[in-house]
Amino acid sequence: LDVLILCQGTVVYRRGEFEREGWDRVMAVNLDSLMHISRKFRAQLSQASGSIVIVSSISGLKANIGNPAYAASKAGAISLTKTLGQAFAADGIRVNGLAPGLVDTKLTKVTTQNAERLQGALAQIPQRRMGTPEDMAGAAIFLASPLASYVTGHTLIVDGGLSL
């Protein structure tokens, strides 16, 4: 196994993450599964001197109104990227991350399908556009490739300048 891309995520809207059930569900998908899957494929990745790319979110670096579990789980994913980058390096495995900004996905439909909300979101992004799957793929390919052979434990922010 050369590359393992971990790109799972869920969110609970309408303040559901403030309840135990919503919190636990989001944490299980967005954070716990990252560790479990990384551990499961560690030996295979080590045999190939492979690479893991953990997709988190810009929400892991800033507050996310109404979604505390989502923000905390993505912050945890960023920290896990650092920790696994250090822990797995001796096995020849590089672990890096990707923190997307606004990309049109199932999880962002609440914004992308509301013209007023979308306009407000785009106004905060210096490039004045959403990211695309191709934008994210390019960054992931770089992190997984030999071009990033001396990079581990780092999360690359790909957000059109939103975090500036």
Protein language model annotation of sequence segments:
Residues 14-27, 121:
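Substrate-binding pocket helix/loop in short-chain dehydrogenase/reductase
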Residues 43, 86-90, 149:
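Alpha-helical segment proximal to the catalytic Tyr-Lys
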